[in-house]
């Protein structure tokens, strides 16, 4: 449920900021190495442990490497919740342990107009990423408690709306009332399985196949 909310927030945010239903630029994905046997593929909400190197496309200069700049240690992150670049969330789905990918990330899915550190504004980025481990993502009990304002173990439309408004404000997005209402209705249509007008703790924590 939490990951569906994040995906819904991201989709609406993109629409609002672009001013039209224009598709986002896509990441170019090249598989450099793939294991013969793959027991599990990454999906939204998974914890991933990776080594990576990042380069500027324009001149091939290295701006970060976990091997060189992170005491040689790989990094953990959660896929699909905007914890990392949008380009990573898009380009690292369906990946196997032992797989290596090269991602070409356009500015809109990287650091955009602002840039960051050694990365100039409007830079296309190249990442070589090696997946070392996949784990189940964090439990969503804490998120449910945060949303359940009256502690009745079920979420009303008002409670979900308040949560979404806070998440939008956290990311600096301004969305009008009608957008919030439409998003809440869409969430309840998908998550309120018994159609009683509330999302129960069970419905909230249930992991849907499409996630």
From Swiss-Prot:
Entry GO MF terms: calcium ion binding; peptidyl-prolyl cis-trans isomerase activity
Superkingdom, natural source: Eukaryota
PROSITE patterns: EF_HAND_1, EF_HAND_2, ER_TARGET, FKBP_PPIASE
Disulfide bond entries: 38-96
Top-level class of the enzyme under EC nomenclature: isomerase
Activity regulation details: Inhibited by tacrolimus/FK506.
Record domain EF-hand: where: 135-170, 179-211
Keyword Disulfide bond applies: yes
Signal sequence extent: 1-19
Function field: PPIase which accelerates the folding of proteins during protein synthesis. Has a preference for substrates containing 4-hydroxylproline modifications, including type III collagen. May also target type VI and type X collagens.
Protein name according to UniProt: Peptidyl-prolyl cis-trans isomerase FKBP14
Gene behind the chain: Fkbp14
């Amino acid at each position: 449920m939490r990951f569906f909310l994040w995906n819904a927030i991201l989709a609406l945010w993109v629409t609002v900021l672009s001013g039209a239903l224009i598709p986002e630029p896509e990441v170019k994905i090249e598989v450099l190495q793939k294991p013969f046997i793959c027991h599990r593929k990454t999906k939204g909400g998974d914890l991933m442990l990776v080594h990576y190197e990042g380069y500027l496309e324009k001149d091939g200069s290295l701006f970060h490497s976990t091997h060189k700049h992170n005491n040689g240690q790989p990094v953990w992150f959660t896929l699909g919740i905007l914890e990392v670049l949008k380009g990573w969330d898009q380009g690292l789905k369906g990946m196997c342990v032992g797989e290596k990918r090269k991602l070409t990330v356009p500015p809109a899915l990287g650091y955009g107009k602002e840039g960051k550190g050694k990365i100039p504004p409007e830079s296309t980025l190249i990442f070589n990423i090696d997946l070392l481990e996949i784990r189940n993502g964090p439990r969503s009990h804490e998120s449910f408690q945060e949303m359940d304002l009256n502690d009745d173990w079920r979420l009303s439309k008002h409670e979900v709306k308040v949560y979404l408004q806070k998440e939008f404000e956290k990311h600096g997005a301004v969305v009008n009332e009608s957008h919030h209402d439409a998003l809440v209705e869409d969430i309840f249509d998908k998550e309120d399985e018994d159609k009683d007008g509330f999302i129960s703790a069970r419905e909230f924590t249930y992991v849907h196949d499409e996630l």
